[in-house]
Amino acid sequence: MKLKLNFLPYFSFIPKKLNTNSIIFKIIKVFFIAILLSNSIYLSFFENIFTQTISPFLAIWGLVLLLKSKTSKQYFWIGFFVGILWFWWIGLSSIYFNLNYLVPIIPIIIGFIYGLLFRLCYLLKFDFLRLCGIFCISFIHPLGFDWFNWGIFTVYGFFDPSYRGIICIFLIAYFIYEGYISRYYKIAIVLILFFSGFQYNEKQAQTLNLNYKLINTNISQDQKFLQENLKSNSDILIQDILQAINEKKELVILPETAFAFDLKNTKYELMLKELSYKITIITGAFHVEKEHTYNSTYIFKKGNVYILNKHFLVPFGEEIPFFKDLTKKYFLKNIEEFSKGPIQSKYKLDNQIITNAICYEATKEQNYQNSQIIIALSNNAWFNNSSEYKLQQLLMKFYASKYGVSVYHATNGKENIVILPKKLLSKDWKNLSKEIFNDKK
């Protein structure tokens, strides 16, 4: 006896008289599947125990419906909308280079790229191979940009935040879709896969020994680097540091390029050195050395300053990976490229080894390997009013959970966050059940 998947229609509320062959319906259908495959990003705006529970199951539903799509065009358009839903915000940064016309063009190009990748997966003859192809898209990193990662499916829910959890999610989707297995075998296989991918343990991460404070700033990108604002913004930061000292903090962490200039040999460097006798200061700023400009982390400690330079640079934001002359002539005329620092910078605080990460670097898996604590500085004002920072946080949560790392993230433009390895959702449900029953008593 075979299990028919009548419980997985595209929309159960669609009227029977609606023409399911119409272009509008087909667009709605592929867009809905793309939403399911992007649900983790948008449900993260409403994070609670219920959204966390359903998120991976919505992803499974999306994968099942993807497999039910029987034409290469459907695969293309699903990939197209997935690319846009994940990365529509990338074009927003072009506003600050006076390239406003690129805001809608860039997402369309990205959607087209992922549409082609999904369509290539359809060319594989068997459904299982197609699903394997979709899984492998996560390992394609154009220009080193690795933010398309199915691992975000496991940040929420019962599945282990690792490749074990991800693979089980994909296999569950395949066996739910597969029509040549009897109902009872199918149920057994899905249950085995669910418990194989289940999170049974919580990884323990080191936390900072020092009493710390994360400073959050909210300076818009179009105002941040204006010469007339540098002094007033810097003076506010000094006041924030003094406030942390009054609060008896031992460490204060400021965002990326909090001081939006080269700190060396300025009055603010002298002030920070003096204040560092009372509190350790970590801040972002530029660093110019021998005609090289770096996006850097400055560490002020007991009158000394240590500078760590960013290695992973944002393509076409901090470096131009190719066609440099053409790009500078017609598009990024005023861009100043950054130079690269060491691949993984570390320093010591209170006998703890800290990994340095600046914005984009906080989502690089290499920085989580052989790390215990990461202090990350970001400027999210580049992509204000977007889902960029939520995707960034999901990637950080995935890697922090996978490797057992704690992340202390100070930002400009969005809220600060401290990330620890994923807790057991089953525990949260158990605690919620106890609260409900205790209230009834």
Curated annotation (Swiss-Prot):
Catalyzes the phospholipid dependent N-acylation of the N-terminal cysteine of apolipoprotein, the last step in lipoprotein maturation. One of its GO terms (biological process) is lipoprotein biosynthetic process. One of its GO terms (molecular function) is N-acyltransferase activity. Keywords: Acyltransferase, Cell inner membrane, Cell membrane, Membrane, Transferase, Transmembrane, Transmembrane helix. It comes from Campylobacter jejuni subsp. jejuni serotype O:2 (strain ATCC 700819 / NCTC 11168). It comes from the Bacteria. The keyword DNA damage does not apply. This is Apolipoprotein N-acyltransferase. It is a multi-pass membrane protein. GO terms for cellular component: plasma membrane. The chain crosses the membrane at residues 23-43, 45-65, 75-95, 97-117, 133-153, 156-176, 178-198. It is found in: Cell inner membrane. Coiled coil: none annotated. Its main location: membrane. PANTHER family: APOLIPOPROTEIN N-ACYLTRANSFERASE. The active site is at E256, K310, C359. Pathway: Protein modification; lipoprotein biosynthesis (N-acyl transfer). It is an enzyme of class 2 (transferase). InterPro entries: Apolipo_AcylTrfase (IPR004563), C-N_Hydrolase (IPR003010), C-N_Hydrolase_sf (IPR036526). Residues 215-441 form the CN hydrolase domain. Belongs to the CN hydrolase family. Apolipoprotein N-acyltransferase subfamily. Its EC number is 2.3.1.269.
